[in-house]
Amino acid sequence: MILICLCRQGFEKEVAAEITDCAAYAGIAGYVKTNADTGYVEFVLPDLDSATALFEAIRFDDLVFVRHWFVTPAIASDLPKEDRASPLMASAQALPPLAKLEPITLDTNDGKALVALTRGVTNHMRTVFKKAGAFNAKSDWVGQVLFFSGEQACIGYFPQSNGSLWVGGIPRLRAPKDAPSRATLKLEEAWHQFIPREQWDQRIAPSMRAVDLGAAPGGWTWQLVNKSMFVEAVDNGPMAENIMASGQVTHRMEDAFRFAPERAVHWLVSDIADKPARVAELITRWAENKWFKEAVFNLKLPMKKRYIELQLCSEIITLALDNAGIEYTLKFKQLYHDREEVTGHLVLF
């Protein structure tokens, strides 16, 4: 059995390190196979029981660099152009009952070129499955069809209760026309990732007070204003005029690393481009003073040792809060709209 882990192109090494560490901690044997810039990693498992144990032991939401995952019995090669579906149908005999079957693609130029082929083959297989009565709407397993090239593909499955919110791990969010930058989508995606949709009305509510550190030109502030919050935007740079015209934003032209709020707020957000450890220390200072209830922040990772750097930044925050006796939850995720960075979510209790 092979666990396929999809990721941002160029982050295969980080995924390999992360899934190896998580599997080892759970006592699950396996080894990685990876190629640079392919957008995926293979984690080879000894048998079906190991795959089942892995899904039970590792929570997908605890993984940072893995965008999406599923298990496949094997990767089929040398698929005939006249009938690519039959070899995949044969491989599907080893799968549990599926609730549905989805086409997914790698987030690379080669992967995008295979969208039409993947959809066509998947639609054909769906028709065959439906005629055979093979789908079970009550099943937790979702089938996946992925093409690596025109001649190589696989069919696999993952549990709906322990996987990505989005098909293939890619969200379908539209950039608002009046937002000052596309960075606004990072915060929107972060809310989807870290906060259950049914809790939005309580946790992302109108009239809440928020601080945006390093706010200019206002991509993240726009999201807060759009949720009818009152925002202190901290940045020496200029803010977009339409955001300031809302009447909900106070522009503090100060150094984000030195700013201290006059009173605690509900939301702290930050997309500062600085050394990740320095940003982690900034978030820690705010947390130790209990100046917020929830925070979303980005850490810009270095080109080398990104996985190690993230662990160090996480330790900066957790060690300080543990020593202070503060209850919290801290999670990280490399979002689809992130680049050489990861997004953190810290909740204080």
UniProtKB/Swiss-Prot annotation:
Q: Does the keyword S-adenosyl-L-methionine apply?
A: yes
The family database entries (InterPro entries) matched by this protein are listed as: RlmM_FDX (IPR040739), RNA_MeTrfase_FtsJ_dom (IPR002877), rRNA_MeTrfase_M (IPR011224), SAM-dependent_MTases_sf (IPR029063)
According to the UniProt entry, what is the EC number of this protein? 2.1.1.186
**Keyword Nucleotide-binding among UniProt keywords:** no
Q: Catalyses which reaction?
A: cytidine(2498) in 23S rRNA + S-adenosyl-L-methionine = 2'-O-methylcytidine(2498) in 23S rRNA + S-adenosyl-L-homocysteine + H(+)
What's the domain of life for this entry?
Bacteria
Entries under Gene3D superfamilies matching the protein:
3.30.2300.20, 3.30.70.2810, Vaccinia Virus protein VP39 (3.40.50.150)
**Where does the UniProt entry say this protein principally localizes?**
cytoplasm
Q: What does UniProt give as GO cellular component?
A: cytoplasm
Q: Which UniProt keywords apply?
A: Cytoplasm, Methyltransferase, rRNA processing, S-adenosyl-L-methionine, Transferase
**Residues forming the catalytic site:** K300 (proton acceptor)
Cross-referenced SUPFAM superfamilies: S-adenosyl-L-methionine-dependent methyltransferases
Q: Which GO terms describe its molecular function?
A: S-adenosylmethionine-dependent methyltransferase activity
Q: Where does S-adenosyl-L-methionine bind?
A: A216, P217, G218, G219, D235, D255, D271
> Where located?
Cytoplasm
> So what does this one do?
Catalyzes the 2'-O-methylation at nucleotide C2498 in 23S rRNA.
What does the similarity note say? Belongs to the class I-like SAM-binding methyltransferase superfamily. RNA methyltransferase RlmE family. RlmM subfamily.
Instruction: Name the NCBIfam families on file.
Output: PRK11760.1
Per its record, how is this protein called by name? Ribosomal RNA large subunit methyltransferase M
State the encoding gene.
Answer: rlmM
